[in-house]
Amino acid sequence: VFGRTLGDGVLNIVVLAAMGITGFVVGWRPSSGPVMITLGFLFLFLFGFAMSWVGVLIGLAVKDERVAQNATFIAVFPLTFLSNAFAPTTGMPKPLQYVAEWNPVSTMVAGCRELFGLKNEFGATAGSFPSDNPLLMSIIYMVIIMAIFIPLSVRKYNNAANK
């Protein structure tokens, strides 16, 4: 299982490189220095690594690969669209603003914006702990996700292998 997630990590590096190059070609220019930009890509890599464990558990829990793809989409879709990734949260109803505020995707997006030297436009909940500390919150979320999903995935894998 660890080999699979490390393989996903290699694929994520290729994807991050392609995204960075594509962004640069279309006009994205980070305003921070090379160290901060590298940290931003490292941060994205680590978040992807943590989330790959969610995918591993989903993949082990279902019997069919198409079901695994759909189940992963069902898990990721709300997290992405209930975040500040595509638009500020100010247009959301108040209850959804608070969901978006504490969403791991929102803190990751805000943290990466800071690392790349871009303005952190967190949205309507600016001034809250997640909006003021997106890097710290992202690290906390990554640790929690891995602390939950690595043992569950390994256990599920071992149970399946022992059948």
Features from the language model and the residues they span:
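Alpha-helical transmembrane segments and their short interhelical loops
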Residues: 2-72, 133-153
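Small-residue-rich segments of transmembrane alpha-helices in multi-pass membrane proteins
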Residues: 73-82
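Short hydrophobic, aromatic-rich alpha-helical segments embedded in or entering the lipid bilayer
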Residues: 81, 86-126, 136
